[in-house]
């Protein structure tokens, strides 16, 4: 019903009502009835009414009064004020606006007069904005496009003003825009505004408004979003991504002048995509047995890609709160991977890694998972069920091995796993016999469970203890994790204290144990391990007077060799190594260490160093300490390739005898110089490959360095590590050279020596035989068809895995080979083709889970970058490089962004892509810990729901807590019917309960009994807000004292 308004006459009456209601703490249901009466007697415009309500809050002088948001909500529900007007006027009366507009009018002297500093309104502002968002989410938003447009413009004004606001109060120039996130209340408003915009765009009128914005409004909103989204990346990545998508889909940018007609016309198509997507209903999710089987295979296909937090986050995304299924299927999958490895005849080193994951990694991870769970996980039950599902032929009992024909490779694995579980307190030791079904043939380790701090203390007291621990790190007893933690922490401490002698000993021990490096990466990332080592090498101070130079070279070389062993074994990038400085010595060595320089390009110091080393190696009788003291280790390693180039050129030109050259290079077989052979052999291999003339001298030198006639015992282990590092590169160049010079007989002996070192590298690359088998598909289609066949076999096995406990043959190297040889986009097309086929045959649920897992599975090329993004580390100081290749997830994102044409051509395929993209993003979602403890993820999920319902049990408990308050309302004089009596009389009657006791005690109790505390401070306001929505948005109120028992006496 419309009223003729007279703001001038009605304003004082409404102001009096608000003053009385606030001072007497009138609950929202009573305020609603009073407002109905008041509007009939004293009609008023919405602009004047909302101004009066907001002005009334200043009378309390409190930062937070819960009644104000409730009163505003009541008036909005009654239709007396609209959502756009609430937001517009709220901004004008906000602390943010006051601080951003300090001058209000000219004074008598003509100068501006600053406003008086008022109590902060931010907590109230935030709650009102949240209520607006709740209203829109529950389908009670603007009914017309114009109203939605006004809300968008109001939000844009809020964002612009908020970002111009100075939290420090010293003016906008004193703070950076991102500083708003450091202010708790400001950060809450920042998040609420973004979520409000997302909520509005989720409605039909919101989409219509965005599609029909005027040029002025589009520019205003575009400017606001362009300023908001960069800061939002530090607040919530899902929110930022959603706003980015909105801005792109609706072409909302500050200026449209640079955009062509074709791009502008895409707006309608993008809206159609959004509408199409909103009609795509997700199918029920299923966790197939093949899912974790694929994922663990991917974790261990190359270098171990394990980050406990990320892995647990993936498992939580996959299983939700079903911890029992999570644990049971995780154990089962680990056994399946080991079983598959045996049937595929994987290498002994791969089988060792699979076994180490099951025995040494999984039990402590389960203990970590159990400790972080809010509810107790029945581990023994889970383990019992998991063991009942593993293939008995692959994991026979000890007694069964006697009746089997040699198939007892994994006979000890079950009891190794169980004893490791007992070691980590997952099960009692007494349960092992029952779980095995026979008497165990081993016991718990003699020393029991190792503790990191104890081991560190032992190493500090006796450095030789580190060597003893490393000798036992590869045993299958369950203590590897503690050993790794202790060794790495000791290394980091030695780096910080620059105790390089002890550090050298540990690095040498690790360098000669390639399998130990695999074990270490089950527990620690390469960047965590190596960053302190790289920093130490980068910052190594060289003093010519520091003492024995050979000892310094020895220590430096040992540390460097371990870094190089990690780098070449796992094909690590500078980001993987933890290098973030462009002038890093390690970075320069990796980039240019194997490349020689022309003499004219050397600096004077480099020329001096080069001459000194040539003299020491080929002229003098040996390398003296004096000849080394003038050249730092860093300078020497960067000169090695040039030293070889100049020396070999001199020999080939007849300026140096071959025996002199050979004898000089043999000095590099001394332990303190041996690591330099990595650069020397790499350069020499490239030189041989590039040479078209005489190769005699180069090949003789290479053979002498690869297979020296004599070498000391200490140097043998280092030499073996050097050949492990350089063998792959040398093999490729020598095979190509042999193909060009088939008559030469001096190349094959070198290749024969290098062959034993090929298994050193672990990168997930496939061998040529395996690759050819995947390409040679009888049906055609090559690698992609082979991947589809593998996909199909995984779906078939997951349909009923109990029929065949033996898992289908699978290696994630096949996926990696497909991505590397034909590209992620073609592999993805094959997966979607097979997904479509499986969906049509009734296996859609399982196929979606398997396809999503294949896409989510980690890759070495992107893993470190994903780790950094997962932890949201500071990326401003050192910008992150892009991923080395397009991942399957990236390719799916591109498919998702280009659906407009596919929707018309193949809507079924478009639906598959949308569902698959949702499933992948759900599995890969990162938990956001936003400022103010705002659970943005839950709120975002709620916004996309058609209806938000509360938890029935919580609602029941809430109702059980309210009966006393509801009953006590009967004793309060409240209006009845639609035509209550005299307003003043009713106000006086309502206030009588408050003022009955002159001391205020009874008044406070009466107020509480009347439901003022319960309803006025976060209870049921009686204005149509459901409990479910209150639950959803309650986490946004951590900055507000709604959850504190307010002192009502002080408020009266």
From Swiss-Prot:
GO MF annotation list? transcription coregulator activity
Q: Which UniProt keywords apply?
A: Activator, Nucleus, Transcription, Transcription regulation
- Kindly list the GO CC terms recorded for this protein: mediator complex
Question: Which residue stretches does the UniProt record annotate as biased composition, category Low complexity?
Answer: 959-970
Protein name stated in the entry: Mediator of RNA polymerase II transcription subunit 5
- The set of disulfide-linked cysteines is none
From the Swiss-Prot or TrEMBL record, state where the protein is found.
Nucleus
Q: How does it assemble?
A: Component of the Mediator complex.
By its UniProt entry, which InterPro entries does this protein fall under? Mediator_Med5_fun (IPR014801)
State any GO BP term from the record.
regulation of transcription by RNA polymerase II
